[in-house]
């Protein structure tokens, strides 16, 4: 199943020109000759978050950008949304970490009843908006995710795990914003 979208400035401003147009005069960036065509192979929503795998992303000849995605359930690799905090569970965490490749991944391990966790949440969301080269995840350490929390060695909440290339490279325990920021910057530069 493939969904082809061609977007242009004209199609966004004029209802007479639908965004599904494949007319090259309407699917290019005005004055540049560059195409805005994107091909999608599939997607899914997990816990209300749009999650995808990019199989191939490269700049094509003439400026065309092509991205393809596969159904992201089961053992398929997944990718979190950049610039947002993505909530994960025991089933979605490792596939997202694997899909991140060499990008740093920061995991906020929290509980609903934890006061310091609630205090850190807005700061953590701002970090996600600021550091677009880092994947920000959060894991509710409830009964359902207990096995993953144990696997990651949680002892206190909040705990922030910093991962890179499928391995934990840093940890910050407690609501220590400055230490978290240092750990993120260290992971980005390594």
Curated annotation (Swiss-Prot):
Disulfide bond recorded as keyword: yes
CDD domains reported for this sequence: TRX_family
Transit peptide start-stop: 1-77
Domain Thioredoxin: 78-189
GO MF annotation list: protein-disulfide reductase activity
Site (Deprotonates C-terminal active site Cys): 108
Oligomer and partners: Forms a complex with heterodimeric ferredoxin-thioredoxin reductase (FTR) and ferredoxin.
Function according to Swiss-Prot or TrEMBL: Participates in various redox reactions through the reversible oxidation of the active center dithiol to a disulfide. The F form is known to activate a number of enzymes of the photosynthetic carbon cycle.
Homology family: Belongs to the thioredoxin family. Plant F-type subfamily.
Protein name, UniProt field: Thioredoxin F-type, chloroplastic
């Amino acid at each position: 199943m493939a969904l082809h979208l061609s977007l242009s400035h004209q199609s966004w401003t004029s209802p007479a020109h639908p965004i599904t147009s494949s007319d090259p005069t309407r699917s290019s960036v005005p004055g540049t000759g560059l195409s805005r065509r994107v091909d999608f192979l599939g997607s899914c929503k997990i816990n209300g978050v749009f999650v995808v795998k990019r199989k191939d992303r490269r700049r094509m000849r003439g400026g065309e950008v092509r991205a393809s995605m596969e159904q992201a359930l089961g053992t398929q690799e997944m990718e979190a949304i950049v610039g947002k905090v993505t909530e994960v569970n025991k089933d979605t965490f490792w596939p997202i970490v694997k899909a991140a490749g060499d990008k740093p991944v920061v995991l906020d391990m929290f509980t609903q009843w934890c006061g310091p966790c609630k205090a850190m949440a807005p700061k953590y969301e701002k970090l996600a908006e600021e550091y677009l080269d880092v994947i920000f995840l959060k894991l509710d350490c409830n009964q359902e995710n207990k096995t993953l929390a144990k696997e990651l060695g949680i002892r206190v909440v909040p705990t922030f795990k910093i991962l890179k290339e499928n391995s934990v490279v840093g940890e910050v325990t407690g609501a220590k914003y400055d230490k978290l920021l240092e750990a993120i910057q260290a992971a980005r530069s390594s």
